[in-house]
Amino acid sequence: MSEGKVQQKQQARRAEIVVAAQKCFAEKGLHGASVADIAREAGLSVGQLYRIFASKEAIIEAIVSEIVNARVGEMIDENHNLARKAAVLAGRIPTSAATKSDNYLLMEINAEASRNPRLREILMQADRRLKEEGGRLSQRNQPGLSDARRNAASELIAVLTEGAAYRCELSASTPVDKADLEALYNMIFDRLFDEQA
């Protein structure tokens, strides 16, 4: 078998393991899903899985990388469309089931990262990448912002995004007028990216 075919097969196997891990984490939680569960779901032995991923953390790193790549792709596609971002955060544009699942997993990884330095480093790398990409888009769209302001804006958007993800299920119990919420997000974004402020 050629080297290219071997790499293709390994990439396909990696992808199968990642999908199996996502399913196991969704069903059993990050702590409850074992490497044996993931291997079984992927149709592999534990030994075969360990030939592809050195640890459970390595699988989590691959999942986080996929989520970040998808989110960077969305950021690029949306081209710093803050009005759309406000509508999404307010819940006027529905979040896909896959995005909700990713959000729940990231929240669980974040909680575990307080006890696991490797997971903390994985999340910090992901956060840096998202902020760098967001900063590049912001630089293109608001070239007059200082780097300090751009960095602060990226942090605030991360806080708002993660907070909205956390609150999405909770807010159903105390309904909020989504149009009012969207208007508030737009007001924040207008002020945040005001080059004169």
List the predicted regions and their residue ranges.
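N-terminal intrinsically disordered/low-complexity leader segments
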Residues: 1-12, 196-197
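Helix-turn-helix
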Residues: 16, 20-58, 62
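Hydrophobic alpha-helical connector segments
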Residues: 58, 62, 73-103, 153-157
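Short, basic, alpha-helical segments at the C-terminal edge of helix-turn-helix-like DNA-binding modules
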Residues: 65-71
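Outer-membrane beta-barrel domain signature
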Residues: 68, 76-80, 124-125, 130-138
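Amphipathic alpha-helical segments used for helix-helix packing
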Residues: 97-124, 170
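Hydrophobic/aromatic-rich alpha-helical bundle segments in the mid-to-C-terminal region
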Residues: 120, 124, 140-197
